[in-house]
Amino acid sequence: MMVGLIKPYSGEVFLDDQRITDMPMYQRAQLGVGYLAQEASVFRTLSVEDNIMAVLEFRDLNQKERITIMEDLLNEFGLNHIRKSKGNQLSGRERRRTEIARALAADPKFILLDEPFAGVDPIAVQDIQTIVSKLKERNIGVLITDHNVHETLTITDRAYLLFEGSVLKAGTPKELAADEQVRKKYLGENFELR
């Protein structure tokens, strides 16, 4: 609903006091809503640097500013050594880093991550957790939807646990982990927050 893929049955969606319920995805992106899908979204026939530049071309920047931002993102995400590699040549980890760098090229206020921990190895999980921490440091709001509870609760300030289509509990990770109903219905009695 936040990015505009589905319409709400009721209620409204607001961003900074602006109603965006009926806005298409591209207008929401222009207002600062970034989205990273669970499925691979890297442009497979473009190089890593062209993937990033493709987004920068839509921003009101001159060429020098675009190149500076692209270089900064390549450096920040450790992509310099593969900058000329095509999207279809990247490992899963490199692809994910490229997708996140590309999403940041739009200069979002919020970024929505759909199942960022799905199907990735433990090193990639740590990598994504580090990246999310960096996003928070940049004052970018991060909304994560994921079934990997341990990985997600480790990096969130606040969480909403959905169970059978409704919010079972909202609160800090510690509050969720300590809640008797949450443990009984979703986490299990032996769940421990790391």
Per-range role (PLM):
Residues R19-E39, Q63-I67, R83, P173-R183:
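ABC ATPase NBD coupling module
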Residues L46-M53:
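Short coil-to-helix segment of the ABC ATPase nucleotide-binding domain corresponding to the Q-loop/switch region
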Residues V3:
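Helix-to-loop junction immediately C-terminal to a conserved catalytic motif
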Residues Q18, K64-I82, Q129-S133:
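Conserved ABC ATPase "signature" region
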Residues I111-E115:
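Catalytic Walker B motif of ABC-type/P-loop ATPase nucleotide-binding domains
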Residues K86-L90, E94:
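Conserved ABC ATPase signature
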Residues D107:
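Conserved catalytic motifs of ABC-family nucleotide-binding domains
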